[in-house]
Amino acid sequence: MASERPRAAMIMAAGRGERMRPLTDTTPKPLLRVHGQPLIERHLERLVHAGIQRIVINLAWLGGQIRDYLADGTRYGAAITYSEEAPSALDAGGGVFRALPYLSPGPFAVVNGDSYTDFPFETLTIAGQYDSHLVLVPNPAYLQGDFGLARGEVLTRGEALARGTELFTFGGIAVYRNAFFAGAQDGVFPIMPLWQRSMAAGKCSGQLYSGVWEDVGTPERLDALNAARITT
């Protein structure tokens, strides 16, 4: 079936950032800077460069700072809509589900606001027979991997181990269709059960990306990233 590019994108920005404390006691994690630029601003600019101007950002912890910094997105060539989750974040599944009215019609991309990558968003697509598409990355030293990849489809960790295939880490970039969230209800819920359902049905495609990628999850990783020479 023909592949489609995402028509909109959501940047996940509502989390408390517990592992990044004390930095996140006063600054939301997506506004932490790598080489002088907030993580979320880099994602926004790269999405717009890839032709995705319709952007949704979910907010909870210190969300007002993100809104104040990015405003309506005009200066970036974007049209930003904010999805409020206060007083606390709805987890990944609940956060995206609440934002569906702003993202429809799909397909749409979802990007973790606390990652750093040079992934080329202009190449991101999803084929017609799938309801989800995950970008996987080689495992960093601090992770063992949660998913396998076989013939362009993502496998659960259990299935990958059973088949003896290599494990990879979710790279914080995905594409979804509305059908992926069938049966979900507004509230707090993780996205993993929906991934597992999609994988079991053979509806979750994937790709491996081996370029620049870092989960900026701790102060030590942030310091290391800022100390590194990065040209992207």
Q: Which residues are covered by each model-predicted region?
A:
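Conserved N-terminal catalytic core of the sugar/cofactor nucleotidyltransferase
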Residues: M1-I11, R33, Q37-N112, F121, ...
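Active-site metal-binding loops of divalent metal-dependent hydrolases
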Residues: R16, G113-S115
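Conserved beta-strand segments of alpha/beta enzyme cores
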Residues: P30, A79-T81, D131, K203-S205
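Short beta-strand-to-loop element that shapes/binds the nucleotide-sugar donor at the catalytic cleft/hinge
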Residues: H133-L149
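Catalytic-core segments of class I nucleotidyltransferases/pyrophosphorylases
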Residues: P107-A109, Y116, F121-G128, N139-A141, ...
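Hydrophobic packing residues within well-ordered alpha-helices of enzyme cores
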Residues: M20, I66-L70, L225
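A phosphate-binding catalytic loop at a beta-strand-loop-alpha-helix junction
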Residues: R7-L23
